[in-house]
Amino acid sequence: MPKIVKKEPKFVEQSGKKVTKSDEQWREQLSDEEFRVCREQGTEPPFSGKLLHNKETGVYACTCCNAPLFISDNKYDSGCGWPSFDAPLNNEAIRYLEDLSHGMVRTEIRCASCDSHLGHVFEDGPKTTGERYCVNSVSLIFNKSDE
């Protein structure tokens, strides 16, 4: 069983900008699957996400509000079935919450700007940080670098 990252639950507004919309507004903006995962804390099936095997250079941003969350330099293949990163873009990008669902104790990660569910963070990552940010592909959009 993966070790759980014990981070102090926090809410940090990214660049002082917080995105707030009603469920109705989110439903108009997002696909059914995006809404289920991002707004209702769902999970996409493992090995099904379009960004799982993406190896291009760029920034992974929030599907809901386009806030930058992760960079390609921090992405790695953990074998878990979801895109994995060893660190977020910065400490202000992510909100951490205790998740007691499904009979487990985990640390949920959300976008700090719009509170979108991203996935979970575990302490079984690579030696660089020891952390694995396990993220649903549907929670992310990829912005390719011009390089």
UniProtKB/Swiss-Prot annotation:
Catalysed reactions, as listed in the record: L-methionyl-[protein] + [thioredoxin]-disulfide + H2O = L-methionyl-(R)-S-oxide-[protein] + [thioredoxin]-dithiol
Cofactor binding comment, as recorded: Binds 1 zinc ion per subunit. The zinc ion is important for the structural integrity of the protein.
GO terms under biological process: protein repair; response to oxidative stress
The protein, known as: Peptide methionine sulfoxide reductase MsrB
Domain of life assignment: Bacteria
Binding-site residues, Zn(2+): C62, C65, C111, C114
Lineage of the organism: Bacteria, Pseudomonadati, Pseudomonadota, Gammaproteobacteria, Vibrionales
Keywords attached to this entry: Metal-binding, Oxidoreductase, Zinc
MsrB domain segment(s): 23-145
Family affiliation: Belongs to the MsrB Met sulfoxide reductase family.
SUPFAM superfamilies the record matches: Mss4-like
Positions of region (Disordered): 1-25
Organism encoding this protein: Vibrio parahaemolyticus serotype O3:K6 (strain RIMD 2210633)
Cellular component GO terms held in the UniProt record: cytoplasm
Keyword DNA damage belongs to the record: no
Gene Ontology molecular function terms on file: peptide-methionine (R)-S-oxide reductase activity; zinc ion binding
